[in-house]
Amino acid sequence: MIVDATLPLLLEYGEAVTSRQIADAAGIAEGTIFRAFSDKDEVIAAVVEKAMDTTALEEALAAIKLDQPFEKCLDAAIAAIQRRVVDIWQLMSSVGPRFHPEKAGPTPISPALTTLFETHRDRLGVKPADAAKFLRALTMSLTHPMLNDAPVSPREVAKLFLYGVHARSASC
């Protein structure tokens, strides 16, 4: 409850958010915050930790109806990944670097995204897990606000993923 109420406040006020604002948003007394957390920094750290959890993204990817055309599945998957990239970027931009998580290694491949590619294996020239890894990397790089001056639509990302930039089919 406290963590969920704090996220929109962090996006609006950053670390300058007050415990009073958090309490008001959560509908609790200010002292209640400090029975659950030792200080405001601990609340912010909990918000960041929850935001970094990939469960919501995995659920969104798993909810994609795999019986629809491959391109529609890709568009839906890309849109979900793009939302996550932007949401995480906004949060990380609103808090100081001391709240940025220390990551020990690469993020595991999404099981739901791999399943999407396994379902459409006949359209792939690579293993489903590799396709999942490549789509995630391409989507992230074309979505991150610091790497692009304008958003790239899910359809454009999907076209680039599927067909590349070559005008004719390549024979490498």
Question: Language-model segments: which ranges?
Answer:
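Solvent-exposed, amphipathic alpha-helical segments
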Residues: A5-E12, E58, F134-P145
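Helix-turn-helix
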Residues: M1, A5, L9-E42, A46
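Short alpha-helical scaffolding segments that buttress acidic/His motifs in well-ordered protein cores
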Residues: S94-G96, L135-T139, F161
